[in-house]
A protein has these predicted regions:
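Paired acidic/hydrophobic, glycine-rich loop segments that form the ligand-binding mouth/hinge
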Residues: 75-80
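Pocket-flanking alpha-helical
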Residues: 1-3, 83-90, 224
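Extracytoplasmic/periplasmic solute-binding protein
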Residues: 1-32
């Protein structure tokens, strides 16, 4: 940092960071979460200390950290596996890229969602089922993952040499990196609450001298309204 003015690292998604930090502390992000608890404040302070000391940053107006990484103003960042294409584009062969699993036991799984709605006709439901069956075959999952950067949902695809040898930096480590995945509970208000956590953390980390306790108290009140 002192020699090259390069920030150590950061997280693309602050809500992902916050939720995953709490999960590894044994706390689930749901309606029972108390944002003013010691573990919640610890999660915020960990990132805030890094920002203050210059070894962490947030994406901010860059939206994603792949661009700063490509411009060599940040040494590493935690983001979606689907960002590999953007990272390669930003780096443009200027330096060697390396990848590694998330640095914690519990890892959040997020991605593209496909649903079959109850309001659909019988014919539409059958068509949706046939499409999902088609999309989730081993061969199609390899093609889909290669083209999108998302993780295959079928283990046979993940463990296949064909997938591992696609040229993706992530493909060879996916099997080990996805051993302990978790998702947020599917409850009413979850999406709004999750997005609000990103807004709150960004407001804290973007300020020079934030009142963390006050902002977390306000976050608690907002969550209570969301969960109602």
């Amino acid at each position: 940092k002192e020699k090259a003015n390069i920030v150590g690292g950061g997280f693309d998604s602050l809500s992902n960071y916050y939720t995953t930090y709490l999960k590894n502390e044994g706390v689930t992000f749901d309606s029972k979460l108390d944002p003013t608890s010691d573990k919640s404040e610890k999660a915020v302070d960990y990132y805030l200390d890094g920002v203050k000391k210059g070894y962490f940053r947030i994406a901010g107006t860059d939206k994603y950290l792949s661009a700063p990484f490509g411009n060599e103003t940040i040494a590493m960042f935690v983001g979606s596996n689907a960002s590999e294409t953007f990272v390669k584009q930003g780096v443009n062969n200027k330096f060697e890229i390396g990848v590694a699993p998330y640095p914690a036991k519990e890892v959040m799984q997020q991605g593209t969602d496909l649903f079959v709605f109850n309001s659909a006709t019988a014919e539409q439901k059958t068509a949706a089922y046939e499409f999902l069956k088609f999309l989730t075959t081993k061969d199609n999952q390899i093609t889909w993952a290669t083209q999108t950067g998302y993780i295959p949902v079928r283990e046979s695809a993940i463990n296949s040499d064909e997938y591992k040898n696609t040229g993706s930096l992530i493909a060879p480590i996916i099997a080990d990196a996805t051993k302990n995945l978790f998702t947020n509970p599917l409850v009413k208000g979850m999406d709004s609450a999750y997005r609000e956590s990103n807004t709150v953390l960004e407001s804290i980390l973007a300020e020079k001298n934030p009142d963390v306790k006050s902002k977390l108290e306000a976050f608690k009140s907002t969550l209570m309204s969301i969960w109602e």
